[in-house]
Amino acid sequence: MPELPEVETVRRTLAELVIGKTIEQVDVGWAKMIKRPDDVDQFKWLLKGQTIRSMGRRGKFLLFHLDDYTLVSHLRMEGRYGLYQQNESVAKHTHVRFVFGDGTELRYQDVRKFGTMHLFQSGREQMEPPLAKLGVEPFSDQFSAKLLTERLSKTSRKIKSALLDQGIIVGLGNIYVDEALFRARIHPERLAKDVTVAEVKILHQAILNTLTEAVNLGGSSIKSYVNGQGEMGMFQQRLDVYGRKGETCRQCGTPITKTVVGGRGTHFCSVCQK
């Protein structure tokens, strides 16, 4: 599933392609993706004539800011956007097409059909699900070591599970939680409330450093991820633990271990992380 670095990269690359374009028509081939409004025909009607003014992101959600509405899109496992000429053939698994007035169209493709779209009156999107109860943004001024300490101290869950909770901090998934915990030398199965203040301070910086580096490298292309211009990310080449089960730790030479924490595959070094 695309995490913060991947969604942020999609936001940036799509912004270069679609800002200023006006939607003339919307075609929906898989109605179950449209979660709001309930009526797909209304979804299409409301978007007609709307111009994309800016692109935003909230956690793992992509936001299209239009004249009067905000389209909130979640890519889920394998969703992707791409800009095409209208006369180009439509690929299999293309489920939503936003047809513009300049001969181009934005296509949403999703092999597994897990992606979702919600349309809100501008300004309402932050007040209602799926955005209303999301936690702090890692790159915001509100995300401090003190805040992270307070939130982790209030949960009895393991640190890996706590960091995956989008109500605590948004944008982190399996990849970047594993990587940040490795950099902070914290074992993923430790209880969050038992992590010391000093350790949380290191973890806070590890989260920021990991996400910043990943964004700068366009995210991680583990499976099918590409950005809005069809380009792969490069951060997968720097992964220390994620996806490296059995390979040697770059710090100590111990084979990387994979276990399951909270139902999620988890990679770590049994020597470096305590």
From Swiss-Prot:
The organism that produces this protein has a lineage beginning with: Bacteria, Bacillati, Bacillota, Bacilli, Bacillales
* The record's free-text note on cofactor binding: Binds 1 zinc ion per subunit.
This molecule's function is given as:
Involved in base excision repair of DNA damaged by oxidation or by mutagenic agents. Acts as a DNA glycosylase that recognizes and removes damaged bases. Has a preference for oxidized purines, such as 7,8-dihydro-8-oxoguanine (8-oxoG). Has AP (apurinic/apyrimidinic) lyase activity and introduces nicks in the DNA strand. Cleaves the DNA backbone by beta-delta elimination to generate a single-strand break at the site of the removed base with both 3'- and 5'-phosphates.
> Could you give a single Gene Ontology term from the biological process aspect?
base-excision repair
User: Binding residues for DNA, per the UniProt record?
Assistant: H93, R112
EC no.? Answer: 3.2.2.23, 4.2.99.18
Quaternary state and interactors: Monomer.
Official protein name in the record: Formamidopyrimidine-DNA glycosylase
Catalysis performed (reactions): Hydrolysis of DNA containing ring-opened 7-methylguanine residues, releasing 2,6-diamino-4-hydroxy-5-(N-methyl)formamidopyrimidine; 2'-deoxyribonucleotide-(2'-deoxyribose 5'-phosphate)-2'-deoxyribonucleotide-DNA = a 3'-end 2'-deoxyribonucleotide-(2,3-dehydro-2,3-deoxyribose 5'-phosphate)-DNA + a 5'-end 5'-phospho-2'-deoxyribonucleoside-DNA + H(+)
